[in-house]
Design a protein with these regions (language model features):
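Exposed, interaction-prone extracellular/peripheral surfaces
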Residues: 2-57, 73-78, 87, 96-132, ...
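Short, Gly/Ser/Thr-enriched beta-strand-loop segments that form substrate-interacting elements
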Residues: 84
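A positional/architectural concept
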Residues: 61-65
């Protein structure tokens, strides 16, 4: 961690004192602060020291700079890298893709701020970490001259912001994220991701990049079906935000967990219980990872007590 701190301070300057939210929610100032990481994400040095996960994120904002215009018969001199092998196999003669210059790109974040995201045992809640990740992607989109759109889901309502490339639009998104982050501390709702995903599916263009930022605790069959459809049309990223307590059971002892007015006491002395505990979350993660593998999505995990940039550095 000491090396990471020196590296980040070298590129970003000393980190300002924590403002406001104290990990319970992301303040507008904290969301705006995420912009300070953008120059480094775009820098040459970034390519040499980040993990493969971070490289996957960066690739969403680069693209080819072109979009598919048509598919026609292969002609002498065409780039063989543009051959459409599916059409070629079907028609038994070579076909190639023709591309036109892409003016801009749409980047979407589906931000899950429903009830199960209001949980955290170290540093900050999952909802807070997810909010900061969404803000970082937004700033990176604007810097790259892409249009950024966001769907903020609180378990009941979905707040839709259409893609645009403007600071005013970005500020409106950040204000709503912070506002919802405060409100869900008092009243939160459990809901399926299928609701915001269906709204996105109705309007999204092909070749867009979509980041679903969630803990995927409500990753039901309906949500999987919609995401599978989106994966065929877009570059889809599953950003799995989780707490360390969801990764492994705490040390042997008795613990109490509170959710609203409900209280649950559990005993971790028994090794059998600790193994069952670990396997429960490991199996859920494996289901999501298998979905991503099957539908060619990118899976990236962020733990709340590490922060996005620590995650990018840790697989050096």
């Amino acid at each position: 961690m000491g090396k990471l701190k020196r590296l980040t301070e070298r590129f970003f300057g000393p980190r300002p004192e924590k403002i406001g939210g104290n990990g319970l929610y992301a303040t507008l100032e904290e969301l705006m602060e995420q912009r300070r990481y953008v120059p480094y994400l775009k820098s040459h040095q970034f390519n040499h020291i980040v993990s493969s996960s971070a490289g996957d994120v960066k690739s969403a904002f680069k693209g080819r700079g072109v979009e598919l215009e048509e598919i026609r018969s292969y002609a002498f001199g065409d780039d063989i890298r543009d051959i459409d092998w599916r059409v070629t196999a079907r028609r038994q003669v070579p076909y190639t893709k023709l591309f036109a210059e892409e003016k801009d790109r749409e980047i979407y974040v589906v931000l899950d701020l429903s009830a199960h995201m209001v949980f955290g045992t170290r540093i900050e809640l999952k909802s807070t970490a997810a909010s900061k990740i969404a803000a970082l992607f937004g700033w990176l989109s604007l810097e790259n001259k892409d249009r950024f759109g966001c769907l903020i889901y609180d378990g009941k309502e979905t707040y839709v912001f259409k893609p645009q490339n403007s600071r005013a639009g970005m500020m409106a998104i950040l204000k709503k994220i912070s506002e919802v982050g405060v409100r869900i501390l008092k009243q939160s709702y459990v809901g399926s991701l299928v609701k915001p995903l269906q709204l996105l599916q109705q309007t999204i263009k092909s070749r867009a990049a979509v980041f679903v930022v969630s803990d995927f605790n409500e990753f039901d069959d309906a949500a999987r079906k919609v995401m599978a459809t989106l994966a065929k049309r877009t570059q889809l990223y599953c950003i799995n935000v989780y707490d360390v307590l969801e990764d492994r059971a705490p040390k042997s002892g008795e613990y109490m967990v509170a959710e609203g007015k409900e209280r649950l006491v559990f005993d971790t002395h028994a090794k059998v219980f600790r193994n069952m505990y670990h396997n429960y979350f490991a199996e859920k993660r494996a289901v999501l990872q298998e979905f991503c593998r099957r539908f060619s999505c990118r899976y990236i995990a962020f733990r709340t007590d590490e922060g996005p940039f620590y995650r990018m550095f840790q697989n050096r």
